[in-house]
Structure formats: structure tokens, C-alpha cells
Amino acid sequence: SIMDRRGKDAIAVDALGAPGFAPGAPKEGFDAIPMWVADMNFPTVPTIPEAIIARARHPAYGYFSPTEEYFASIIRWHETRNGVTGLTKECIGYENGVLGGVVSALNIFCSRGDNVLLHSPTYIGFTHSLENNGYNIVHSPLVKDENNVWRMDFEDMEKKIVDNRVHAAVFCSPHNPCGRVWERWELERAMELYKKHDVMVVSDEIWSDIILGGHRHIPTQSVSEDARSRTVAVYAPSKT
């Protein structure tokens, strides 16, 4: 269904003309058509606002701790959706969004001023978050193969890791903005490389629930026991 989002503080329509977005509002007689992939014009499934409204009716908004149901729901989702087993509540942490989780993980693995490996093209949220927190970005460009498919350049990745003394990487799976759903062999080879050079991996998997038919998301942590121990996977329900 088509929603009128004007006046609801939606960046997709109310921020036209703001820095970093569309240069200005449409001319008179023309409509703004939201086509932002990261903020699709789909209504939220009714059960979610219903649950929020029901909770908001209670007047206490003090400190809280996650419930057992919260942890069980996440564990069940990963088991049934992604085939990840063995998760416990101790494996799960809450962060203020994926980018907050990325930075928090890097703050554990790295010191300010350290070099962090990212693939390019790079999601601008990574760029701003890492630079604003004092990390240096080392890009390893993705390359197109003979079928015009974006692939990781493993030789370039290894050279960048060694030359720049990289010990942490931000990995995007599925990749934003290229849209690649990585195949198992690609993930295995990347994680073997990270293991070889003791690189910790922060894997942004926020897009894993929006995948075209014929493809399957494989969680980075699931490709080996070593990958499980060196990967921090970050998810959010905000895309779906």
C-alpha cells in the first residue's frame, strides 16, 4: 500500500534539500517519490505497533532489562532462519543500532588510530562512524568477475592487511551497497585469511532477511569454529 509520510519526520520525504540528501523539493505540481532502499515505503506489520502501543499505555518508562522471551526469540530466529545453533543468552548483547554495535566491537578489539579493513564501495555509515571514532579506514576494492559479479579480491585483502598491520575488519554480509549475498566458499576463504593474520571481524548482517529468490544468507560465524570465535555479528529488525 502507498503511505503518505509527509510531516512524520521521515528523512525520505521531509529532509529534501538537507545536506547529503536530495538538493531540493520537487517543483510545484510534482510529487516526491521515496525510492530509498534503506527506508522502503512498506508499512510495518500491524503486530509490531500494536505491541508498542500496548506497552506504552503503562505509564512507567524506567530502567529495564531484557526478558527471557527476548533472548529466546533471537536464538529461535537464528536457528530456524539461519541454521545457527549453540547460541545462548550470553552470546547476545543489545546496542543502539548496528553502527553503535560496530563501534563498540571495534573499541574492544582496537585502539584509536588503528587501521581497519573495509571493502569498497563502502556504506557511508561505516565511513562516518569509523572516522568519527578515530579509526583509519583501509579499503580493499571489490572487483567484477567475467560475469559482472562483484567479488572480494583476496590477494589485495591480504596485502592490505599485512602492509597496514590490520587486526580488525568490518565485513558487510549481504554487502551494502553492491547487494552481494556471499557464497559459502567466499566466506570460508575470507575467514581463512582473517585467521591467518589474526584479524577480528565485525560482520554487519542487517540485510540478511531481504534476499532475492535463489540465494541464501550464510552467517559469517557459521563457516568454521574459528570464524565463530573471531566474529561479532550485528543484526537489527529495522530493515524488515
Identify the residue ranges that each predicted region occupies.
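Short, solvent-exposed coil/turn elements at secondary-structure transition points
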Residues: R5-K8, A38, V98, V143-D145, ...
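PLP-dependent aminotransferase class I/II
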Residues: R230-T240
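Short, active-site-adjacent cap segments at secondary-structure transitions
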Residues: F42, S208-D209
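Conserved core of the PLP fold type I
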Residues: R57, Y61-E192, D209-I210, G214-D226, ...
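Residue-level marker for buried hydrophobic side chains located in beta-strands
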Residues: V201-V202
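Walker B catalytic acidic pair
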Residues: E205
